[in-house]
A protein has these predicted regions:
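Feature captures hydrophobic
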Residues: 1-151
Length: 151
């Protein structure tokens, strides 16, 4: 239970089709993130999952900074595949991490990149800021979904 005594929708729900749809809406609605990614020409398949599972639980197809598709099934070979334990995802969706927290998570392997080059990405200020913003949007999507489910 969280501090408001409301059940937290854990990772199975975090990576649900409903959550992915909400993430796509929030991501594409927020001009800051998509315009930053458009500036650097970011187009990629990004996947999220947990370390002990072979396949990711969620896939995003990002074209010129905007999410074109967000699905639970494979949308191609991911260029970025981020993995973390379920409890870590829960923590990040409750309180989105900053750049320092993400760096520490990468260093201690609680955030793993099966595909993608974190050290190179983090050296680019626009990409680093976009990476942090993406976690904030994931949290926002989770909170909006929880709010809708309560009403």
């Amino acid at each position: 239970m969280n501090l408001l005594n409301l059940p937290f929708a854990g990772p199975q729900q975090v990576f649900s089709a409903e959550w992915l749809e909400m993430l796509q809406i929030e991501w594409n609605r927020r001009e800051g993130l998509s315009s930053q990614l458009r500036q650097v020409g970011f187009s990629s398949v990004v996947a999220f999952g947990v370390p002990h599972e072979e396949q990711p639980r969620a896939y995003l197809v990002i074209r010129n900074g905007e999410i074109d598709e967000a699905k639970k099934q494979s949308l191609g070979v991911p260029q970025w595949d981020l993995r973390a334990d379920e409890s870590q995802w829960q923590s990040w969706f409750s309180e989105p991490p900053g750049l320092l927290a993400l760096g520490m998570a990468f260093t201690n392997r609680s955030l793993q990149f099966r595909h993608g080059n974190y050290p190179a990405m983090i050296k680019d200020p626009l990409m680093a800021e976009s990476f942090v913003r993406s976690f904030a949007l994931m949290s926002r999507a989770q909170k909006k979904l929880e709010s809708e489910q309560q009403n």
